[in-house]
Amino acid sequence: VEIFMGSGAYICGEESALLESMEGKRGEPRNKPPFPSEYGFKGKPTVVNNVETLAHSYTILKFGAKKFRDLGVKDSRGSKVFSVSGDTPIPGIYELELGMSVQDFVDDFGDGDTKAVQVGGASGFLVPRKRFGKTSIGYQGKLTGISLPTGGSMMIFNSSRSMYNVLNNYLDFFEEESCGQCTPCRVGCQQLLKGIRAVKRGEKPASYLDKLLKLTDTMKLTAKCGLGQSVANSFSSIVENFREEMIY
């Protein structure tokens, strides 16, 4: 076992950018195909897995698949490790069964005044209070009743939080972490950040938010990797559910 220490770049969560970094190069996504399973680390076929996947593999091999499948719900079997942060009295790391509703999660971890929950970190979706009972945390679909745990990060926001500030922070983060290799992500993140600030200052009309939503659709289709594609998740879910906070 050899451990490579990275510099913490968010883009290196993308598998091919991670391989580039391990080879001593700048962390940038590769063109696909070929995929890492064909041409990976130093040109060799490579399996890239999250450490949690390897941990699950060990427990499944040790205790059997049935014990793992007894956890969770249909199509979302097993458990997942979540980091819980934000407006919660009990922040920390928890292993939870998949399939729970966001309402159940809020009942366990909220502070009694939860306004919204970000499921899956900055790249995930923001779930507003009105959808807590209708949205589950599992592997099926998206916010049509089920929310993807794209990552194990769960951020809780109470009524004291400005959703404009939340989105501004996310976009500032994405602009900083974009590798700059592809135009949709590099320029798109900049324009989204400038756009919401212009609307907030009254320099652009509220309808300009609709143009920004169309821009995120373009980024989702044309960005080279998951970073640029996933910016649309938090942007659209925040703007569509808390539009008034983007304006006033």
Regions found by a protein language model. Name each.
Residues 1, 111-145, 240:
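Terminal amphipathic helices with adjacent charged low-complexity linkers/tails
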Residues 4, 85-87, 96-97, 108, ...:
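Generic beta-strand/beta-sheet core signal
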Residues 8-11, 123-128, 217-226:
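Short, surface-exposed loop/turn segments at secondary-structure boundaries that line and modulate
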Residues 92, 125-128, 165:
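Short acidic/glycine-rich loop or secondary-structure boundary segments that cap or lie
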Residues 100-105:
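Short, structural beta-strand-to-alpha-helix junction motif
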Residues 135, 139-248:
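Ferredoxin-type iron-sulfur electron-transfer modules in oxidoreductases and energy-metabolism complexes
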